């Protein structure tokens, strides 16, 4: 499969999985009433409405702030999709697809609910990770993929320079 269709497929899969988990947890379970639901000694499901971005940064409690975050998410998704259309590798296209799917998933939440629904809480002892969702995980994995691709490209360039010398 060529990079662009692959990246778009990854974006669509990320978006569908994100929205399906959110809708299922909000409307098909009693999580909003019975939280937290303990999955393991280190993981639980909770309901958190995040009006900001990752890690709860840039909290927006106004309609203007909400719609600015929606606009930034949509513009980022468009720009990353344009980048995806020009890439030559499935790795890079897939990484971009994870970010695009996650950005659109969280934008849908902001449009529908005024905030992003986060629900996975990981913790151990006194340590607690921020509460996140599938879209957030997709964005983080996508950024990791971009970093991996950059390191891989740098190594490839270094090998080519050495072989030319």
UniProtKB/Swiss-Prot annotation:
Q: Which reaction does it catalyse?
A: Release of signal peptides from bacterial membrane prolipoproteins. Hydrolyzes -Xaa-Yaa-Zaa-|-(S,diacylglyceryl)Cys-, in which Xaa is hydrophobic (preferably Leu), and Yaa (Ala or Ser) and Zaa (Gly or Ala) have small, neutral side chains
One GO MF term attached to the UniProt entry: aspartic-type endopeptidase activity
How this chain sits in the membrane, per its record, is: Multi-pass membrane protein
Q: Which residues cross the membrane?
A: 64-84, 91-111, 127-147
Gene Ontology BP, a term: proteolysis
Annotated signal sequence is none
Q: Which family does it belong to?
A: Belongs to the peptidase A8 family.
Q: What does this protein do?
A: This protein specifically catalyzes the removal of signal peptides from prolipoproteins.
| PANTHER family membership | LIPOPROTEIN SIGNAL PEPTIDASE
The record's annotation in HAMAP family points to:
LspA
Q: What is this protein called?
A: Lipoprotein signal peptidase
**Native species:** Methylobacterium nodulans (strain LMG 21967 / CNCM I-2342 / ORS 2060)
- Report which gene this protein is encoded by: lspA
